[in-house]
Swiss-Prot record:
Record-listed E.C. numbers: 3.5.2.7
Family, per entry: Belongs to the metallo-dependent hydrolases superfamily. HutI family.
Listed GO MF terms: imidazolonepropionase activity; iron ion binding; zinc ion binding
Lineage: Bacteria, Bacillati, Bacillota, Bacilli, Bacillales
Keyword field contains ATP-binding: no
Binding site for N-formimidoyl-L-glutamate: Y157, N331, G333
Record-listed Fe(3+) binding positions: H85, H87, H255, D329
Organism superkingdom: Bacteria
Cofactor binding note of this UniProt entry: Binds 1 zinc or iron ion per subunit.
Protein name listed in UniProt: Imidazolonepropionase
Length: 424
């Protein structure tokens, strides 16, 4: 039987309490519900008690000898970080495109000439299930070392029914085998494959009539995503795909307004999407409609940074009442990173967000963006015992001392999975 874990004397225990019922918006994104000299008791995989060290020492005075005690003196304790937008399961690498972009090629130029998503699609189609599992597990291990305990994972590098199912089956197997929880998204509409270049509507029909029903039948995904962008899928095609997903029980998400304004934010609001992601070029009208419809903005500053583009205006979105989450967009072409803490720092430096806001965006709002805020995203009694401990005294220092992995300890479902910065 696993011993209880008792975290004691945290310099700051950032609980993020109070935001489980609905996404956190506006000024409340700066409210972290911090407990100084904080303490938390984890048992049977869930959080049993949260408070000051004095409170827990009194409450558990007869059980102290039972617990594995972690001294968090001088450290920041937060909920396990949550990454709500990744392309985790893929094969291959695209470092050659990095040099092409440095020499002036754009993302869409590379893609339209057979690179980009098409390059990764070819590698992923060629990879076996076992090869995809092994490569993706390595990424998950790195996520864990950077404090992440839950990730969303998209398909979208298969673009055939067989290969999309292969990606989703790998994600399912990883979810069962790895400490990190994985929430899967079907994204067969990530790109129009080259074999359908002359007839993209036929591919859209296949996504709607063949892929979505089979993914839903096998219960391999929670969400259905589409890349709504000029040269990829039009707003009309995107609407058809998202509405088809809803008919089969898949919740809508959308890659929106990344390269240019394309009414993606407006479409997200219209179809009641759980989130709209990227939004670098979202219109003011679209932002307002997202706020009214309760669509979460999942912002990906690492992608803009890596593509040398202007970031999404996170400050404007928060000030206009949009709930903002933040993510790595881990993928081989435009954001090959697993460091969510670094992405949080970019949220401050490139999107005008405060250190408190980016922590909210990487925990409770990220949980809402993948519909699991009832289980994770805050340190509250009854939630999963997912905790990250950083070697910094407070949440401000976490963003101030950038480019360093400050993760000391990660606890998943009450089990220590990272200790002293290494996999346990």
């Amino acid at each position: 039987m696993t011993k209880p874990v008792w975290i004691r004397h945290a310099s700051q225990l950032a609980t993020l309490a109070g935001g489980s019922s609905s996404p956190v918006v506006g000024a409340k994104m700066n409210e972290l519900s911090i407990i100084e000299d904080g303490s938390i008791w984890l048992e049977d995989g869930v959080i049993q008690r949260v408070g000051t060290d004095e409170d827990l020492a009194l409450h558990y005075r007869d059980r102290t000898h039972e617990a594995q005690i972690i001294d968090a003196s001088g450290k920041l304790v937060t909920p396990g970080l949550i990454d709500p937008h990744t392309h985790l399961v893929h094969a291959g690498s695209r470092q050659n495109e990095f040099n092409m972009r440095l020499n002036g090629a754009t993302y869409m130029e590379i893609m339209n000439n057979g690179g980009g998503i098409h390059s990764t699609t070819a590698a992923t189609r060629a990879a076996t299930h076992e090869e995809l599992f092994a490569q993706s597990k390595q990424r998950l291990d790195q996520f864990l070392l950077h404090g992440v305990t839950t990730v969303e994972a998209k398909s979208g590098y298969g673009l055939t029914l067989e290969d999309e199912l292969k990606q989703l089956e790998v994600a399912k197997q990883l979810n069962e085998a790895h400490p990190i929880d994985i929430v899967s998204t079907f994204m067969g509409a990530h790109a129009v494959p080259r074999e359908y270049k002359e007839n993209p509507d036929a591919f859209v029909d296949m996504v709607i009539e063949e892929m979505i029903p089979e993914v839903a039948r096998r219960k391999l995904a929670v969400f259905n995503d589409v890349f709504c962008e000029r040269g990829v899928f039009t707003p009309e095609q995107s609407r058809r795909i998202l509405e088809a997903g809803v008919r089969h029980g898949l919740l809508p998400k959308i890659h929106a307004d990344e390269i240019e304004p394309y009414e993606g934010a407006e479409l997200a609001a219209s179809v009641g999407a759980v989130s709209a992601d990227h939004l670098l070029r979202a219109s003011d009208k679209g932002i307002e409609q997202m706020a009214e419809a309760g669509v979460i903005a999942v912002l990906l500053p690492g992608t803009a940074f890596f593509l040398m583009a202007e970031s999404a205006n996170g400050r404007k979105m928060i000030d206009r009442g949009v709930a903002v989450a933040i993510s790595t967009d881990c993928n081989p072409g435009s954001s090959p990173t697993v460091s969510l803490p670094l992405i949080m720092n970019l949220g401050c430096l490139k999107m005008g967000m405060t250190p408190a806001e980016v922590l909210t965006a990487a925990t409770i709002n990220a949980a809402h963006a993948i519909r699991c805020a009832h289980e994770v995203g805050s340190l509250e009694v009854g939630k999963k015992a997912d905790v990250t401990i950083f070697d910094v005294p407070d949440f401000m220092t976490l963003q101030y001392r950038y480019g360093i992995n400050h993760v000391n300890t990660v606890i998943k479902n009450g089990t220590i999975v990272v200790a002293e910065g290494r996999l346990a």
